Amino acid sequence: MDLFSPAKLNLFLKLHGKTSHGFHEMTTLYQVIDFGDRLSLESSSEDSLICNLPELNTPQNLIWKSIQVFRDYTQIYSPVAWRLYKCIPIGSGIGGGSSNAATALYALNQHFQTQLSNDVLQELGKKIGMDVPLFFSLGSALGIGCGEEILSYDNDHRDERYVLYFSDQPVLTKDAFSYVRPEDFSKREECLSLYARNNDLEQSVFRFRKDLEEKKHMLKRIWSPFNAHVRMSGAGATLFVSYSREIETDPSTAKALHATIHNSQGLLVNSLRKYNGWFEHGDNLLATTRQ
């Protein structure tokens, strides 16, 4: 079994404060995209994981946590062999580890024909990581609480396209949240349309990653002719540009836009929706995770 393990973007992320347990409460709009990794699974005489990035061949890989959570729930202990081809950069804020964990849960459910419902898989995903439940949505979802409570959302931004800009240096999630200050918090809104399309974590990340702040200013300059919006995804370090597909209907504008993407070394991606059980896409893969 070979599956696509897609990345995600946070189209906005608003922080509202801290819980009594010290976690940050938030509201975020997730969008799965057609860029990601590939994960394969087969029966084996012993558990194994082979990845094209040796640093991910460790017990800390979230795929192992998915296996443990699945086994605890189903009491199925048959060994399996995994092959993971990573394209999503480590520490990039676009959900690589979480996606791999969710894809592994789905693969195990299919492989062993355990027929666990989507709701059960989503609950199991919460035990693994904050973003994991997202991947059991159709692709667009609202995250509340600490981001792990997922509500289906009919994304009215499906006419948007996105251009990704990776960083050579990852951002650790714990570092991003450790720099958050009370003045970074946003008030809760009753209507999603009242939330500005930005990421409150940018303020904390830019306190220790001035290079990303400068990069955002640079991207805003070069994308200014296209009425595009630049922001950070998750805890970083990926910055992305969003723009309306409508502007590509003009040939001269489309030509200038795609020249900008090429010259700025961006990666053009689209939103992705789930059909027939899981996300399917195989074209938008990179040969390397380091841009």
Curated annotation (Swiss-Prot):
Q: Which GO terms describe its molecular function?
A: 4-(cytidine 5'-diphospho)-2-C-methyl-D-erythritol kinase activity; ATP binding
Active-site residues are 8, 131
- One BP term from GO: isopentenyl diphosphate biosynthetic process, methylerythritol 4-phosphate pathway
Q: Which UniProt keywords apply?
A: ATP-binding, Isoprene biosynthesis, Kinase, Nucleotide-binding, Transferase
Top EC class for this record: transferase
Determine the domain of life of the protein's source. Bacteria
Q: Which reaction does it catalyse?
A: 4-CDP-2-C-methyl-D-erythritol + ATP = 4-CDP-2-C-methyl-D-erythritol 2-phosphate + ADP + H(+)
Chain positions recorded as ATP binding sites? 89-99
Q: Sorted alphabetically, which InterPro entries does this protein's record hold?
A: GHMP_kinase_C_sf, GHMP_kinase_N_dom, IspE, Ribosomal_Su5_D2-typ_SF, Ribsml_uS5_D2-typ_fold_subgr
| SUPFAM superfamilies the record matches | GHMP Kinase, C-terminal domain, Ribosomal protein S5 domain 2-like
Pfam family, any one: GHMP_kinases_N
What does the record give as EC number? 2.7.1.148
- Please give the pathway this protein is involved in: Isoprenoid biosynthesis; isopentenyl diphosphate biosynthesis via DXP pathway; isopentenyl diphosphate from 1-deoxy-D-xylulose 5-phosphate: step 3/6
Give the family this protein belongs to, as stated in its UniProt record: Belongs to the GHMP kinase family. IspE subfamily.
Q: In UniProt terms, what function does this protein have?
A: Catalyzes the phosphorylation of the position 2 hydroxy group of 4-diphosphocytidyl-2C-methyl-D-erythritol.
| Protein name, per record | 4-diphosphocytidyl-2-C-methyl-D-erythritol kinase
Which species is this record about? Answer: Chlamydia abortus (strain DSM 27085 / S26/3) (Chlamydophila abortus)
Provide the taxonomic classification. Answer: Bacteria, Pseudomonadati, Chlamydiota, Chlamydiia, Chlamydiales
User: Which gene is transcribed and translated to give this protein?
Assistant: ispE
